[in-house]
């Protein structure tokens, strides 16, 4: 198991017969048995590998100047030993119920809260889970319908890095959260109940890093192959940091490049007008552009490795055309079949 569980509990928020949301609070923590360990380890892995997460902190919303410190205050009391975990989680459930009641679309769910340690950091994981119907076969070979927690499709979840929060009160990224499929607006109520404000634009920071890398290789004396090796090294480093749940560190990245004979990236990135933070979370989908070109439009989707540009893939901006040398075998087969059928 990759985590050490300290506390875990589940409360239910559901609608009564009048359509009003009600809390059903569990009176004691979950026992740290195999089922709990397997569930939380799976959720930890699933959450950590989620791409496109947002990052924020306990703060005041810029638009209306409103603050909702109740969750942060309760968490502070729990960390100070003034509140028990059950009492703290119960207060959190009530806060979420009050926030959910403001919206017509909410059906409630199961609020899971867990404190655990992974590597050297303490975390508080908060998720609103839903139940999913499934079928099973009984011993007498009859079908039976049952409900189970949908752990593979978590959409409303956040994780607070308690170690970072305690060590650096000025940090703006100790809370991570899953963005809704239609953007952050889907999960606004979930962040509002915790008093979380988005603090770091992860995609923008990663895009800026990518631009800095491109400018760096363009201004260097590196050969074409060496430039692509530099891009690949940056992507590999950032991917490793993402998989570890760690931030990209510009100084650390520059040292990695220096080991490959590509000196002075740190001075280049910090000396320009890139406005890069010293540390920020990785976003694989953005940085993947260092290795691949891809685009969709007008019914055409195209994707290829960056190393093929100028060799197998020739782009002519004047005629607005792309020439592909060596059509992939499976695509060639489809095209040949279609031509024969015309």
UniProtKB/Swiss-Prot annotation:
UniProt xrefs under InterPro entries: Nucleoid_associated_NdpA
Superkingdom of origin: Bacteria
Predominant cellular place of this UniProt entry's protein: cytoplasm
Cellular component GO terms held in the UniProt record: bacterial nucleoid; cytoplasm
HAMAP family referenced in this protein's UniProt entry, alphabetically: NdpA (MF_00730)
Localization (cell): Cytoplasm, Nucleoid
PANTHER family according to UniProt: NUCLEOID-ASSOCIATED PROTEIN YEJK, PTHR38772
Protein's recorded name: Nucleoid-associated protein Sputw3181_1720
Family that this chain belongs to: Belongs to the YejK family.
Listed Pfam families: NA37
Source organism per UniProt: Shewanella sp. (strain W3-18-1)
Alphabetized UniProt keyword annotations: Cytoplasm
Gene Ontology molecular function, alphabetical: double-stranded DNA binding; single-stranded RNA binding
């Amino acid at each position: 198991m990759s985590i050490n569980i300290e506390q875990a509990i589940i409360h239910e928020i559901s609608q009564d017969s009048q359509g009003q949301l009600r809390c059903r609070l569990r009176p004691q923590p979950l026992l740290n048995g195999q089922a709990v360990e397997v569930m939380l380890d799976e959720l930890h892995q699933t959450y950590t590998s989620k791409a496109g997460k947002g990052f924020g902190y306990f703060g005041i919303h810029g638009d209306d100047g409103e603050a909702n410190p109740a969750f942060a205050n309760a968490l502070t009391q729990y960390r100070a030993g003034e509140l028990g975990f059950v009492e703290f989680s119960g207060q959190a459930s009530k806060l979420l119920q009050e926030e959910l009641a403001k919206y017509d679309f909410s059906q409630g769910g199961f609020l899971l809260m867990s404190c655990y340690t992974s590597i050297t950091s303490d975390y508080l994981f908060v998720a609103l889970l839903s139940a999913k119907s499934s079928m099973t076969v009984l011993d007498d070979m009859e079908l039976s319908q049952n409900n189970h927690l949908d752990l593979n499709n978590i959409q409303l979840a956040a994780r607070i890095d308690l170690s970072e929060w305690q060590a650096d009160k000025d940090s703006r990224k100790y809370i991570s959260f899953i963005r809704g499929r239609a953007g952050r607006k889907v999960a606004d109520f979930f962040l509002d109940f915790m008093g979380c404000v988005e603090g770091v634009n992860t995609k923008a920071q990663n895009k800026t890093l990518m631009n800095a890398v491109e400018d760096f290789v363009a201004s260097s004396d590196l050969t074409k192959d060496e430039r692509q090796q530099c891009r690949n090294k940056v992507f590999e480093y950032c991917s490793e940091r993402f998989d570890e749940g760690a931030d990209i560190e510009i100084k650390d990245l520059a040292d990695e490049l220096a080991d490959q004979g590509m000196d002075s990236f740190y001075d280049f990135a910090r000396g320009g007008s890139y406005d890069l933070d010293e540390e920020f979370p990785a976003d694989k989908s953005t940085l993947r552009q260092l290795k691949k070109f891809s685009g969709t439009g007008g019914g055409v989707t195209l994707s290829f490795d960056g190393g093929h540009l100028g060799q197998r893939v020739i782009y002519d901006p004047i005629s607005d055309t792309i020439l592909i040398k060596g059509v992939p075998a499976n695509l060639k087969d489809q095209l040949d079949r279609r031509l024969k059928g015309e």
